[in-house]
Every structure is written in C-alpha cells, then in structure tokens.
C-alpha cells in the first residue's frame, strides 16, 4: 500500500509513471552510471525528462545486488524496501502532473535500521530479538522525508543496538546483518554505529542516508568511509520513532558524499515534533541551510584548532592532514587560533553514568510503546542468553547487564552525572568560542580505519573528537580532509548550540577548495 504522502495518486497517474520510466526516456539513460552523481545533478536530469526516479532506484538496486550482496559483499544494506520501485513510479507521475515537491523529490534514501517505518520493512536495530518488528507508525523524520518526496530505498546494517550492547563489540556487526565492510579496504572496519549508512553512501548504493548518533555514530563512520556527516544540534531533528540509547544525546543525522547533499537531506529532516521532549527549544525560524552555501564562507572566519581531543599526537600522518587543513583554511581567508585547550576532566565518567541510566529507561519506553514482542531490557537480556549461539557468537552483552542495574532517572547519582556532563561540555565549547571570538573549532574526526577483529573487538588508534559536541548536544560536521595509506580521514567543524548552518557553510567552503574526497575503487 502506498504511503499517504503520495496523496492517493490515481491509477492513471501510476500508468503515466510506468510509461515515463520505461519508454523513450528509459532508452536515453540505458547504460548510464549514476555513481557519484549529486542530488542537484540528478534533479536536473529528472526535470529535463532524461531520468526517472524509478530508473534511479533500479540503478541503485542493481548496484546493491552487484557489490553489496555479491562481489566484494559490502554487506551494508540489511533490507530493501519492496515498495521502492512503486513509490518511485508514483513520484515520477506526480512530477509529470504537478511538478516537483522540492530537491528531495524522487531521491532514494537509506535509513539506519533503528529508525521506525510503518511499511513492509522491519525495525530491528540489527538484533534478532526484534526480528519481525513492525512499528505502527513512521518515525517523525521518516514522515518528513516522505512529505519531501524522498524514496525510502531500504535500511542499513549497523553496529547492533547502535553499539550499546558490549564493551568488546565489532563496529558494523549485527546478529541480523553480519559484518559490514569498509569499501576502501574490505579487511578494515567501517566504524559505527551508522556503519551501513556510511558505506552505502560511499559506495554509491544510494544518493544519501540517515544515521543516528549518541557519541560519534554519524561522524566516525562518515570520516572513515570518506563522506560528509552532520551531527545536528539536539532538538533540530526529532527522535520520535528511533530506537534510543540516551535522550540527552541521541539525534539522527544526514550523510552524503558532498556537503550540499548532506545539507539538502538535513533541511528535509528538520521539523518541530510535539512528541519530542525537546520541542520547546525548536527555533522560531530556520536558516536556509542550502541557499546560504558559499565558497567564500571562510573569508574572515576565526577558526580554533582543538588540540585536546582523544588520541591527540598519536599519529603523525593524521597530524599532517590537520596541518594541511589549517593551510587550506588560511588560504581561504580564515584566521587561525592555535591551540585551543578545553578542560574536559570528568566529562567521560559523567557521560558513562548518564548513558547507562537513560538507556534502560528510554529503551523500555520505546519497546512498550512500539508494540515489540519483547518489551523490556530484561526481556532482551533473557532472549540473548537463550539464543547466545546466534546473537552473541563474537561478543556479549556487558552494556545491557550494566544498564539493567541502574535505577530510575530520579536517582541523585544520575541527576548529578547529567548536570556535570552538560556543564563540562557546554561550558567548554561556549568559553572557547566566546573567549577567542571563534566561528568554530576544528579537529580530526577519527584516525584511519582499523582492521576488523572479531576476537578482540574494535581497536582504533584512539583519535576521536566527537565527545564535546555529542555530550553538549551542540552541532558538528565532518568533511573529508585527506588520506592515510588510501584510508579517508575527516576533519570536524564543531560549534555552539544551533550553529549548524554556519558549520555547514564553513565545511562547504573547505570542501570546495580542498576537494579531498576520493571515491572508493570498488565495483
């Protein structure tokens, strides 16, 4: 059954769509490779009648079959939407009859598998415990995308439970989806937890994708897979209908091959949702995230170099990319303030308590509301123990067990930890920006992708700059900046609350000058 956002298109309209997508126009695009095409280019072709959304969907489906299911078996897509071609055809008919809804009309999108859809696809967080789970309604962000005319192409594999099950997990592995591979080196890890979303974008299995982040889960996989990822200010993108970890940090975020593509998707995702507890801080007005992009955005900007991130100085090759980034920013007219030091002592410990407390409460609430067959964390723990051979063949559920010991969110220990985590992270960013009159901070997003290891779990270099933005709830964006032995390295632009538009502008200007992204050589 077609989604209501298609406005109950008539049978005649559907016939038009099929004629449009398989007739003369189909002959014009036969054999065309849409790998690496950006959204604006695709829209131009569709507006000219030289491409249909159905043809684009079919191109991606063929590519998924060729290199995700077969060949190198990237294993990034956990499920294909069986209605994708039908929806695309209906949107083609609508375009012919009444024009385009906007820049996302007919554009395929992959969703992380922890995002609810009320269709034939499951929402599982990659866990066999939720196999067969069909939520009753779309997540708010999915409703926004459907309204914008996006085609939900499928769901992406992820680190099971968004990497909140075990202390020894392998990022990109789930009991339903198996191990996702990095397209730049199949033996290396895609990071997580939005692993499949990042790989699908990097390998041109979709135009764009939606990931989710609690701490690093959008920006890390974006960095190591050579794409752009936006971690929004908390409250801009609704969390309703997304399997949670912690409401004080959780957000969905757009992922694309270019800053502009990510910005286009971002603009379509944003909206005030009364069901989200943060609805009261939603801005009265929003900037033009796409129209404000300029190659000159860095001219006169003051950029601080954050040197206190995790793993600072451990990899000289990453340090050289940071120095190259500084040189590019300077050449574009930015004023560099280096170094910027931020005292984060106690932040990580406080975050630890917050996440485990909130996970138990938030997950129990989600499971109960969404009608899942297993409706509590305690039930999940029992299921995993009973089915350990298939659910826990390579790592356990230490995080689940610790979370289950936590009390209610009225506990003084939780309240103190939450206050400390927010105070340290928010004041750290706020003071750095204010005292130095900065537009943004920069830091390497992550080190190069590590070898996937199912015996010892993840073991990266330790380089990471995601925590400040994640814990504070402030904005960040990662953009490709260079490579270490062919492996992508991203640079993060980090700002204050609701600095999203400014960060996107700065990242766009850097991207246009550096042109650092190189597609993976995989087919």
Predicted regions, residues:
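Glycine-rich, small-residue loops and helix-cap segments
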Residues: 49, 106, 112, 147, ...
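Structural helix-boundary/capping segments
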Residues: 66, 151, 202-304, 309-312, ...
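Bacterial N-terminal signal peptides that target proteins for export
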Residues: 1-12
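Bacterial N-terminal signal peptides
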Residues: 10-20
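Short helix-loop capping/hinge segments that flank enzyme active sites or metal/cofactor-binding pockets
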Residues: 105-125, 291-307, 357-424, 478-488
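Gly/Ser-rich catalytic/binding loops embedded in alpha/beta enzyme cores
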Residues: 29-215, 233, 300, 433-435, ...
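Flexible glycine/proline-enriched surface loops and loop-helix/loop-strand junctions
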Residues: 125-127, 181-183, 193, 243-251, ...
